[in-house]
Design a protein with these regions (language model features):
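Short, polar loop motifs at secondary-structure junctions
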Residues: 56-58, 88-94, 164-170, 230-234
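Carbohydrate-associated surface elements
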Residues: 108-111
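Structured loop/turn residues at beta-strand edges in well-structured enzyme cores
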Residues: 22, 46, 79, 100-103, ...
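Extended catalytic core of nucleotide-activated donor transferases of GT-like folds
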Residues: 1-96, 100, 115-116
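Catalytic binding pocket for nucleotide-activated donors in carbohydrate/polymer assembly enzymes
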Residues: 1-9, 55, 61, 103, ...
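Conserved catalytic-core segment of nucleotide-activated headgroup transferases in glycan assembly
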Residues: 113-197, 207
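Proline-centered loop/turn at the N-terminus of a beta-strand
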Residues: 49-50, 83, 104, 159, ...
Length: 304
């Protein structure tokens, strides 16, 4: 349904981009692209009917612009886009409008593929009481140690699994914690479906601004996982606490969930979370939102 062109150098990509822009109805530039400033100029100078910037790193982008860092987007380019789409919602949207002069700022959150992330058969390799999937991140590690590793040390009768690369060799894994350095995406559904609960931890800059759900959060919910998550502003607009997701702020709280929430209750939480993301956060839902935002029906009428 699409063409993908991969260019090693911007000099190779520029002529191709210009050709594609000649008859483009909509042109979108993504964030954290090393030649983003040059690409944005090409888009803004084009005849595309709708010119948009899609920021999947909104807190980082805004922090950079505030510091005068224009690595992939210039401050003066922001007001020139017809539409500024953001992975982050909430108050930050108004800040982009008020401080940077964006014409129209709208949250277009991440999404998940329900054909890949769905309820799967359990796999004995991943059966445990609490799982966590995530690449090592220094600003998340303290939470992982408090909410999983310390919990594991205190409940030797429970089992835990951590999956993700780049964890330092000095990390001390308790005996009842299994560490998997890499898990292929095709095994993700079985991973989520084989643990009683799965833990969601959020990067510090995303917690600070709030309204920044991760792809992993939606993918886990798509698999019907009972999610235990750290809290952040806006989380309740994606999942109802204690009904579709459980919130934790301490080791003791995690341990309490492990002992007091029955398998049936956990399954119910996971099922309701799955229903929520299927209704609101699947890839097709997000595509429909995008089409509505760019006025796809109006564009189509011009060619009728």
């Amino acid at each position: 349904f699409c063409k993908v062109h991969i260019c090693e150098r911007w000099e190779e990509g520029r002529p191709l981009l210009r050709r594609e822009l000649n008859d483009a109805d909509v042109a979108v530039v993504g964030s954290y692209f090393s030649d983003g400033v040059a690409a944005a100029n090409e888009v803004l100078d084009s005849a595309a009917l709708v010119k948009a910037f899609y920021d999947i790193d909104t807190p980082i982008t805004i922090a950079k612009l505030q510091a005068g860092d224009e690595e992939y987007l210039r401050r003066d380019q922001v007001p020139q886009f017809d539409l500024y789409l953001s992975f982050t919602g909430g108050p930050m949207l108004r800040e982009i409008e008020n401080s940077f002069g964006a014409r129209r700022v709208v949250a277009l959150y991440c999404s998940f593929d329900p054909h890949r992330y769905r309820i799967s058969e359990m796999d004995s390799k991943y059966v445990c009481d609490l799982s966590y999937m995530g690449t090592y991140a220094p600003d998340r590690q303290a939470k992982l140690e408090a909410l999983l590793l310390r919990a594991a040390q205190g409940v030797p009768d429970k089992t835990f699994i951590v999956a993700g690369p780049q964890y330092p060799s000095e990390v001390s894994w308790p005996k009842n914690v299994k560490y998997i350095i890499h898990l292929e995406p095709k095994f993700h559904p079985a991973f989520y479906c084989s643990s009683r609960f799965t833990l969601n931890l959020t990067r510090k800059h995303m917690v600070k601004v709030g309204y920044s759900p991760s792809v992993r959060l939606f993918e886990a919910a798509g698999c019907g996982a009972a999610i235990i998550s750290d809290g952040w502003a806006g989380l309740e607009s994606f999942f109802h606490p204690n009904d579709e997701i459980l919130l934790d702020e301490s080791t003791a709280e995690v341990v309490r969930y492990l002992y007091e929430v029955s398998p049936e209750e956990a399954a119910g939480i996971g099922k309701r979370a799955q229903q929520r993301v299927l209704a609101e956060h699947s890839a097709d839902k997000r595509a429909a939102q995008f089409e509505e935002l760019i006025g796809a029906k109006s564009l189509a009428r011009q060619y009728a």
